[in-house]
Design a protein with these regions (language model features):
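Structural beta-sheet core signal
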Residues: 26, 48, 81-83
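Inter-motif core of Ras-like GTPase G domains
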Residues: 16, 33-54
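Charged helix-capping and loop-helix junction motifs
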Residues: 65, 94-100
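Inter-lobe coupling/hinge region of RecA-like P-loop helicase motors
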Residues: 121-148
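Conserved C-terminal guanine-recognition region of P-loop GTPase G domains, centered on the G4
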Residues: 58-76, 84, 88
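Beta-strand-loop-alpha "switch" segments that mediate conformational coupling across diverse proteins
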Residues: 87, 99-129
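P-loop/Walker-type NTP enzyme "switch/lid" segment
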Residues: 1-26, 30, 34, 73, ...
């Protein structure tokens, strides 16, 4: 898979890449940046991950403003939230539901599917691999497949 590293205003880079590739995936990191903002102006889809923790959910106010600004330039931008690193204990389900509700309160629709807190995600990241390349952890693979299918549909 070809990859490009870029920072700053990446709008023109993305527009050039879109002439050569059908699909472009952008990982703009977990903070507000010029790269994130410029990517939002030309992207078709944007998936925003949030852990079901106060520290992440407190950023929803800022994220809502960013989305509003981006949609002023790119009204077709399809945005969704995904809850990640969720606890696996059944007693913690309310934490996931509360995180989804928090997203909805800022007009950010959460996906039904989510990822659980699994070591395989960290292990794969450290090795520069995906969970599909890394292991036989079928639950992690299934989580990612379900998120992709729900978010991208039949693209």
């Amino acid at each position: 898979i070809p990859s490009v590293q870029a920072s700053g205003n990446i709008r023109q880079i993305l527009m050039d890449l879109s002439k050569r590739y059908q699909d472009i995936i952008i990982d703009a990191g977990g903070q507000d940046s010029e790269a994130l903002r410029s990517a939002m102006t030309v992207s078709t889809h944007m998936l925003l991950p949030f852990r079901p923790k106060r520290r992440d959910l407190k950023t929803l106010v800022h994220v809502e403003k960013l989305i509003r600004l981006a949609k002023a330039v790119n009204p077709e931008l399809y945005t969704r939230a995904v809850i990640t690193q969720c606890p696996t204990l059944p007693s913690q389900v309310q934490r996931i539901l509360d995180a989804k509700e928090a997203c909805e309160s800022f007009d950010l629709i959460p996906l039904n599917n989510f990822t659980c807190n699994r070591n395989i995600y960290d292990d794969a990241d450290e090795n520069g691999l995906s969970v599909f390349e890394m292991s036989s952890d079928e639950k992690a693979k299934q989580e990612i497949e379900q998120i992709a299918k729900e978010f991208l549909g039949d693209l």
